[in-house]
Regions:
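Catalytic metal-binding/acid-base residues of hydrolase active sites
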Residues: 9, 47-48, 76-79, 115-116, ...
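Active-site neighborhood of phospho(di)ester-bond hydrolases with catalytic His/Asp-centered motifs
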Residues: 5-6, 42-46, 70-76, 111-112, ...
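Short secondary-structure boundary segments
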Residues: 19-23, 70-81, 169
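N-terminal active-site segment of His-dependent metallophosphoesterases
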Residues: 1-57, 165-176, 191
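Conserved beta-sheet core of the metallophosphoesterase superfamily
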Residues: 86-191
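Hydrophobic transmembrane signal anchors and adjacent membrane-proximal interface regions, especially
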Residues: 31-33, 61, 160
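Metal-dependent catalytic neighborhoods of phosphoester/phosphodiester hydrolases
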Residues: 15-16, 45-65, 74, 79-92, ...
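A general structural motif
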Residues: 38, 67-69, 106, 124-125
Length: 191
């Protein structure tokens, strides 16, 4: 089974988002209660605080205890200068295209840390999953922009845009899903 999550920010305390070290324990507990070692988890960036050896050891310690195969789609906080961190992932990339199933139907996905306004085959049913914006004004602007784009193309008779499905994009910030990785079905049901 595939799971998706972003913006874990392990080891990063932030009073504005009520992020403490307790936050790290909650993510770990929720993750390991849901994910098996046979599952794949796509982490769409911002795994946590890197830097000094102490920070890196903490990050390695917590990530190594998370079940499943972990694929990292890099975010703006990833330096990955420490090989110990990089080795915890089966793959590290900037952008990823995958197929997944939802309600028995195969769906193509575009994965990125950043929200993209125009992505591959967006009006042919491809879904975009992203992070970075958490719950913010930037997220509101992105959602409004995507709505405008869908409304614009809904009434167009341009070649290739007749009867095309609306573009679908979903924020997989962990705070939106009780600090737990989620399946594509859970994402689609929750939106």
């Amino acid at each position: 089974m595939n799971y998706y999550i972003s913006d874990l920010h392990f080891g990063c305390q932030n009073k504005y988002e009520n992020r403490t070290l307790e936050h790290d324990k909650i993510i770990k507990q929720n993750w390991n209660a849901k994910v098996t070692n046979g599952d794949t988890v796509y982490i769409l960036g911002d795994i946590g605080r890197e830097g000094g050896n102490k920070d890196n050891e903490y990050l390695c310690g917590i990530i190594s205890t998370l079940k499943g195969k972990k694929v990292l789609v890099q975010g703006n906080h990833e330096k990955l200068n420490d090989i110990r961190i990089r080795q915890l992932f089966t793959e590290v990339c900037q952008y990823k295209e995958v197929s997944d199933n939802s309600n028995g139907k195969s769906r193509n996905l575009v994965l990125s840390h950043y929200p993209i306004l125009m992505w591959k085959n967006q009006h042919k049913g491809w879904i975009h999953l992203y992070g970075h914006v958490h719950v913010s004004d930037e997220w509101d602007v992105y959602k409004q922009s995507l709505k405008y784009l869908n409304d614009y193309f809904k009434n167009k008779t341009l070649k290739g845009y007749i009867d095309c499905p609306p573009a679908e994009a979903y924020n997989v910030f962990c705070g939106l899903y009780d600090y737990s990785p989620v399946t594509l079905d859970e994402i689609l049901l929750g939106n």
